[in-house]
């Protein structure tokens, strides 16, 4: 597996030698880059929920945190909302100038620790997990890194100085399931257009996998403000649903504190949908969720609050 990853790293970074390369390599430490507003990276993301989902990350600002951090936004409002509700891309939002550190729970986390030199090691927290990282190799401005957690989870990632960011980033859980795979498809500068970042906060999630007699479920949740930024602009929901044949069905209703319906959905026999995103504007106070299931039926729901920022480049 290690040899396969090294081959992937070299292929992505273009470090396989040709007959004209002269066989020389440069193993000098890799320094921290400087990003400019408008720099962009096109990544393909794969998760257990999505396969080969493409997103363009764009530097929207370089003056965050009193001039010590960038703002890394996304060129699609839909993708920005998906991040807010699923939180599968840790490299959106504030990124520090010094180490390109992503923020988690309000603190910068040094996934990279510049200068990157072979054998260097450090610790950080990401995905609510503590990691011990090290640099496996450095060659031609490409640094190959690995990180491990106490539960057996691993991170394998490659930084390429020519693109000034990751060429690959892979998170594997203890059972061997890849929870996140980021592969760089393209990069450039001077992006033009609107870019977005949606600051999210978890509100409610549940999964039902039912079979047999009719079943009705009712629950409620309270929409509190963001701890720092106040009221949410919108509530973002994500859902998967599937009904078996015969008499299988699902009915879903979400009502606010005034009993006004905010979301209503019905699925009949054989109906299904996957990865649906939607929004409910200006959520407030308490919501009541009611779901009825008949026969073989599956429903997964996630709700998050969202506050949208946008920039025109």
Residue ranges of model-derived segments:
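Noncatalytic modules at the cell exterior or secretory-pathway interfaces
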Residues: 278-297
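Short, surface-exposed beta-strand/strand-loop-strand elements in extracellular ectodomains
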Residues: 245-263
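Extended extracellular/luminal ectodomain segments enriched in beta-structured repeat modules
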Residues: 226-238, 284-286
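Acidic, serine/threonine-rich low-complexity disordered tracts
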Residues: 23-81, 99-209
